Amino acid sequence: MTNTNETIFALSTVFGKSGVAVIRISGNYTLKALNHFHIKKKIKPRFATLVDLYDDSNQLIDNGIIIYFPAPNSFTGEDVIELQVHGSKAVIKIILEKLSKIFVMARPGEFSLRAFLNGKFDLTQIEGIADLIDAETKMQAKQAIKQISGELERLYSNWRQRLITIQSKIEAYIDFPEDIWAEKSELEKINNEVQSLVQLIQEHLNDNRRGERLREGLHIVITGEPNVGKSTLFNFLAKRDIAIVSEYAGTTRDILEAHIDIGGYPIILSDTAGIRESSDPIESEGISRAKKRSFEADLRIELFPFEQRHNINCNVVNSDTIYVLSKADDAINDRNILIGGVDFLPISILKGIGTNKLISLIKKKAEEKFGHDRDTPVITRQRHRSHMQKALEHLQRFKIDNPIELISEDLRLAAFELGAVIGIINVEEILDSVFSSFCVGK
């Protein structure tokens, strides 16, 4: 764990050429930086002040903006300075080297860790900050903002407090059994409250991994026979040439991936080898991987040649599959074609037929998977899910006629697991796991 007595610093922006670079300092001795750079101006808290920065030989390093946030009203809860200088590699190096003589370089996530330890955020809010930094699409950012606002913290704190209240009643029986436990109505209230929490947590867990999927991206696989236009469609959706497009069958053997944004939703798109019987061991391995990836995918786009539409025999219909008639250059329009009771969408990348409709259909499927119409808090990480599952298991063991000590212990352990999600309990392994994923300077 970190030594919070040390004053830390780090570059909070990307190292490289830029208009502005931001360097953050936090700790009890933050204001020493003013003398270290020979800053003579009076710095007013929470106001931007233009200053000149000098080295020890009184040579000007750069001029920039300094903002001072006194404790406890800062991001970390400590004295914080944010120094904005020109995004020059040389300037950044000089300033960081000079700061290293009096302060300690922050570890990844150490500023956020101090914010957590000083009660500025709970663990789920801290994770929300990390998710916002990593967000690549509008919907990912929206989910992260909701988490930063404390949506999960309020939910889990409420459930935990309800458990603590129940446990206090159980503990009271241990000390005064004749006053409480004899009341049958009280027993029923306790049992009903526990069962209510069991139902709420079960519903929370049975969310089809919506939050985790949104963080990670929806996996979509383009599948079909060789030379049916998979790579052409892949490149079109990716908006760049990644896959080799060839008239020869079997060109794609390895699985190719592209991270794309459709309607604000993150999509991990895969182009796979054409499915067919092959005596070539390398192609056969590619086909085997294609089948495995297709099976594991959240959604499939299965391509059939438009010119062979009258010979299509679609034996297995899957609601997680979009059926497409590819190379439909001769199609009159993009109206779905019904084949064997299944809707097929004709598309032509060459003529732009059906492409917008396909994108709209992918967006609709993504909305269904992510549950865009639901406004309830969602689990966003496996860490949350593991603790919630353990809490549920403890509550499911609850039986009102169990030994009183066993009842109390199950309630205590369930509350412990809920506390572990938001960081009320101080488990070093949990904190190290959460903050190690942050970048330096955050």
Curated annotation (Swiss-Prot):
Family annotation (HAMAP family):
GTPase_MnmE
Q: Which purpose does this protein serve, as stated in its record?
A: Exhibits a very high intrinsic GTPase hydrolysis rate. Involved in the addition of a carboxymethylaminomethyl (cmnm) group at the wobble position (U34) of certain tRNAs, forming tRNA-cmnm(5)s(2)U34.
**Residues that coordinate or bind GTP:** 227-232, 246-252, 271-274
Q: List the disulfide bonds.
A: none
Which UniProt keywords are given for this protein, alphabetically ordered? Cytoplasm, GTP-binding, Hydrolase, Magnesium, Metal-binding, Nucleotide-binding, Potassium, tRNA processing
User: Which sites bind (6S)-5-formyl-5,6,7,8-tetrahydrofolate?
Assistant: 24, 82, 120, 442
- Record InterPro entries: G_TrmE, GTP-bd, GTP-bd_TrmE_N, GTPase_MnmE, MnmE_dom2, MnmE_helical, P-loop_NTPase, Small_GTP-bd
As for family, the record states: Belongs to the TRAFAC class TrmE-Era-EngA-EngB-Septin-like GTPase superfamily. TrmE GTPase family.
PANTHER family hit by this protein: TRNA MODIFICATION GTPASE GTPBP3, TRNA MODIFICATION GTPASE GTPBP3, MITOCHONDRIAL
Task: Identify the GO cellular component terms for this protein.
Answer: cytoplasm
Which Pfam families would you find in this protein's record?
MMR_HSR1, MnmE_helical, TrmE_N
Q: Give residues annotated as binding K(+).
A: 246
Q: Where in the cell is it found?
A: Cytoplasm
Lineage top rank: taxon: Bacteria
> Any idea what this protein is called?
tRNA modification GTPase MnmE
Q: Which SUPFAM superfamilies match?
A: P-loop containing nucleoside triphosphate hydrolases, TrmE connector domain
Q: Supply the EC number(s).
A: 3.6.-.-
- State where it is primarily located: cytoplasm
The residues that the entry says bind Mg(2+) are 231, 252
